[in-house]
A protein has these predicted regions:
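Glycine-rich loop/hinge motif
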Residues: 133
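Sec-dependent N-terminal signal peptides of Gram-positive bacterial secreted proteins and lipoproteins
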Residues: 1-26
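N-terminal propeptides/low-complexity segments immediately following signal peptides
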Residues: 26-48
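A cross-family detector of function-defining hotspots
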Residues: 47-66, 70-72, 77-118, 125-127, ...
């Protein structure tokens, strides 16, 4: 009886170990393929580089306004009052005078605007939300480019921007994708 129990226990343990390693192998392979795909894309002459975006005159218009649905996160649009955000999403995990936080999503307000706080910018720092076109933190830059096309601008912090801006000014309306060189690390939707 004791031998049978030991044999069954060893069999179960071997199955568990075997399944864990195959999951790790699949994850490793997926990550390696993603790195290879991004590396190949970066070698392409069509891959955007920051220096390609430095020839503009101050005040020059760049890009075009994005559709309204692109300027929304978790059903909230720029210009929405903080009260309407709370009515839609419930009680925030953190609330400050100029910011509402729901996990990895922040809705911000400029204190220089009127006294009734409205959403002026939104940031996503984890996979709690996606853009209207389905991009989330952790997605590859290749996926961003496949869905949004070439960036309208790459700023001095190497963030990819899609939307409308006036070069060297605060007139910026669109989406920034912060990244680590291959993956999106933060999404910012802004109306400065």
């Amino acid at each position: 009886m004791k031998t049978k129990f030991i044999a069954i226990s060893l069999g179960v343990a071997l199955l568990l170990v075997r399944n864990v390693s195959s999951v790790a192998d699949a994850s490793w392979l997926s990550k390696a393929m993603d790195r290879l795909e991004t590396s190949n894309a970066k070698l392409s002459p069509t891959w955007p580089k920051a220096e390609q975006y430095r020839h503009y005159r101050p005040g020059q218009a760049i890009g075009a306004p994005l559709p309204d649905e692109d300027m929304r996160i978790a059903g909230v649009s720029l210009g929405t009052s903080f009260d309407a955000v709370k009515a839609s999403l419930g009680q925030p995990t953190s609330e400050k005078r100029d910011e509402l936080t729901y996990g990895g999503i922040k809705f911000g307000h400029s204190l220089m605007q009127d006294s009734r706080p409205i959403v002026w910018y939104m940031t996503v720092s984890n996979r709690d939300a996606v853009t209207a076109r389905g991009i989330a933190v952790g997605d590859s830059l290749k996926k961003v480019m496949d869905i949004y096309g070439r960036p309208d601008f790459i700023d001095f912090n190497n963030r990819w921007f899609y939307g409308y801006l006036r070069y060297n000014s605060d007139n910026i309306v669109g989406i920034f994708f912060e990244h680590n060189g291959s993956k999106v690390t933060k999404i910012i939707i802004s109306d400065n």
